């Protein structure tokens, strides 16, 4: 920290999460506090909630601001969908719920698997993220086998065609324990699909008033939400339309403009 504090180049740090393990360790928290105060000219949070939680943990850090993460919304809005038979080997009448995320405990993909076990056989879950031998993925796969829904759970691993996969899906969702500002939620909404997410920090702020929120780990509530989206076409369209409008607020150009304006304040012309 001492060496970095003498660096003549202004340093800017971006905080991407509302929670991390270092904050729970008093030694690491104090070290981080020194670094934030001594080394950085500005600390940028990727969302308002990330700014709020950062300020609660490091109240002495005053050089803060928030610049929302953003995505190329047009890329997702204009993507060409696959046929479900082509992508997953299932009928076009099947109702597909997709989550794009690494397989980590905090992502809680198991909640979606549990919800599938409480829904008709026409409901399928599609997971994008992580390698085939990933430990977290294997645990979720085992859960699907235990609940006898493995034929309705599709693991697509790492993909470069996520926009097309989202366009093929009926609902996009995120079942995380917490997020910073979830890009997956914005991408899902930009695809023009209803977005369903846990009512937690980092998701609530983006989804509330547009998509649908459910209680963390509550697979019963999730199953009811998915059933309603499947059976009520007017409700489905209303949520889809609201999500498209919400996604437009997080277009990547807005993020670029925010960072450019910030950097220009520290550039000596």
Tell where the protein language model's regions lie, with residue ranges.
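Nucleotide-sugar donor phosphate/pyrophosphate-binding loop at the beta->alpha transition
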Residues: 9-10, 19-40, 52, 58
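Short, structured helix-loop element that forms part of the nucleotide-activated donor/catalytic region
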Residues: 126-150, 235
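A conserved mid-protein helix/loop that constitutes part of the nucleotide-sugar donor-binding site
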Residues: 95, 99-118, 135-139, 220-221, ...
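A short, active-site helix/loop in glycosyltransferases that binds the activated sugar's phosphate group
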Residues: 40-65, 71-75
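Aromatic "clamp/platform" in nucleotide-sugar-dependent glycosyltransferases that forms part
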Residues: 158, 177
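A short helix/loop element that forms part of the nucleotide-sugar donor recognition site in Leloir-type
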Residues: 76-90, 142, 235
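Conserved acidic donor-binding segment of nucleotide-sugar-dependent glycosyltransferases
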Residues: 212-219, 228-233, 248
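Short hydrophobic beta-strand element within catalytic cores of glycosyltransferases
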Residues: 194-197
């Amino acid at each position: 920290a001492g060496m970095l504090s003498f660096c003549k180049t202004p340093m800017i740090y971006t905080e991407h999460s509302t929670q991390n393990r270092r904050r729970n360790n008093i030694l690491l928290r104090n070290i981080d506090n020194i670094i934030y105060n001594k080394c950085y000219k500005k600390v940028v949070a990727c969302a308002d909630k990330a700014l709020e939680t950062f300020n609660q943990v490091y109240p002495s850090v005053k050089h803060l601001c928030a610049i929302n993460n953003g995505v190329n919304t047009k890329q997702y809005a204009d993507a060409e969908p696959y046929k479900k038979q082509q992508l997953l080997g299932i009928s076009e009448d099947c109702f597909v719920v997709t989550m794009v995320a690494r397989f980590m405990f905090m992502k809680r993909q198991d909640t979606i698997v549990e919800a599938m076990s409480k829904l008709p056989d026409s409901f399928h879950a599609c997971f994008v993220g992580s390698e085939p031998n990933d430990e977290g993925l294997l645990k979720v796969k085992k859960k699907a086998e235990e609940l006898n829904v493995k034929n309705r759970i599709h693991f697509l691993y790492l993909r470069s065609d996520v926009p097309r996969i989202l366009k093929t899906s009926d609902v996009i969702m995120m079942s995380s324990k917490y997020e910073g500002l979830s890009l997956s939620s914005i991408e899902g909404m930009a695809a023009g699909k209803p977005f369903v997410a846990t009512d937690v920090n980092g998701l609530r702020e983006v989804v509330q008033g547009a998509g649908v929120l459910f209680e963390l780990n509550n697979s019963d509530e999730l199953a009811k939400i998915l059933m309603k989206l499947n059976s009520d076409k007017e409700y489905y369209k209303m949520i889809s339309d609201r999500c498209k409008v919400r996604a437009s607020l997080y277009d990547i150009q807005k993020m670029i403009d925010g960072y450019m304006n910030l950097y220009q304040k520290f550039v000596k012309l």
